[in-house]
């Protein structure tokens, strides 16, 4: 589901990837989170690539529309860590 959503944001003719941000778990960053524009990623089988950084899908916490504030995806917090 997550990979399909990201592919849709990247490739659907009515979608503008620069309008979306991916927030992901990055230990050591402020609040253990970093964000990147969907416009700046390359999607792979089980991870995203941003510059030289590989981000596994399981580290994606949220996908958000920057224009509307709509949250398209939010990882379920099952262990109280997020």
UniProtKB/Swiss-Prot annotation:
Region forming the signal peptide: none
Top-level taxon of origin: Archaea
Record-stated family: Belongs to the UPF0248 family.
Listed HAMAP family: UPF0248
Protein's name according to its UniProt entry: UPF0248 protein Mevan_1298
Organism (species): Methanococcus vannielii (strain ATCC 35089 / DSM 1224 / JCM 13029 / OCM 148 / SB)
